């Protein structure tokens, strides 16, 4: 597999004030990993949700307030949090500058169950050829 040029991947708007760039998923040939960057404006991030697999949330730049079950923590650049499979979690940007986080999930597609059912729960899933 040739090297991946991450900047060639498009930025996607996931919700107001949150842009996402997929770095690796089933769409790029991954079988067991999904990795993406998110760029979140002040006060914004990811609403409460769970995944069926483990996730690592790493702060690349900025400061995040992360909720993991009932625990709230402040996470800074070059720090990460392991989110166990099935654990409720969320995060938000608590600084004025844009928060850059990297999420790595132990699955090749993004799947989540959100408290807010209006959120899109599945992304980067390959299409099935029906021909």
Over which residues does each language-model region extend?
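Conserved short histidine dyad/triad with adjacent acidic residue
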Residues: 36-51
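Glycine- and acidic-residue-biased ligand/ion/polar-headgroup-sensing regions
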Residues: 54-55, 59-64
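A short hydrophobic beta-strand segment most commonly corresponding to one strand
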Residues: 82, 96-114
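Short beta-strand His + acidic residue motifs that chelate non-heme Fe in jelly-roll/DSBH
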Residues: 48, 66-67, 83, 89-95
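Short acidic-glycine-tyrosine-enriched beta hairpin
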Residues: 70-85
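A generic "binding-loop/recognition-motif" signal
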Residues: 52-53, 71, 87-88, 97
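A short, N-terminal "cap"/entry segment at the start of jelly-roll beta-barrel domains
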Residues: 1-33, 113-131
């Amino acid at each position: 597999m040739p090297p991946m040029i991450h900047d060639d991947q498009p930025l996607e708007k996931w919700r107001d004030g949150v842009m996402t760039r997929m770095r690796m998923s089933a769409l790029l040939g991954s079988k067991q990993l999904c990795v993406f960057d998110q760029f979140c404006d002040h006060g914004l991030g990811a609403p409460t949700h769970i995944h069926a697999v483990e996730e690592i949330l790493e702060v690349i730049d900025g400061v995040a307030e992360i909720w993991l079950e009932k625990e709230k923590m402040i996470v800074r650049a070059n720090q990460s949090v392991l989110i166990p499979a099935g654990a409720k979690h969320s995060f938000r940007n608590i600084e004025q500058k844009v928060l850059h986080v990297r999420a790595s999930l132990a699955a090749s597609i993004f799947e989540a169950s959100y408290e807010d059912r209006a959120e899109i729960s599945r992304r980067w899933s390959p299409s099935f050829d029906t021909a």
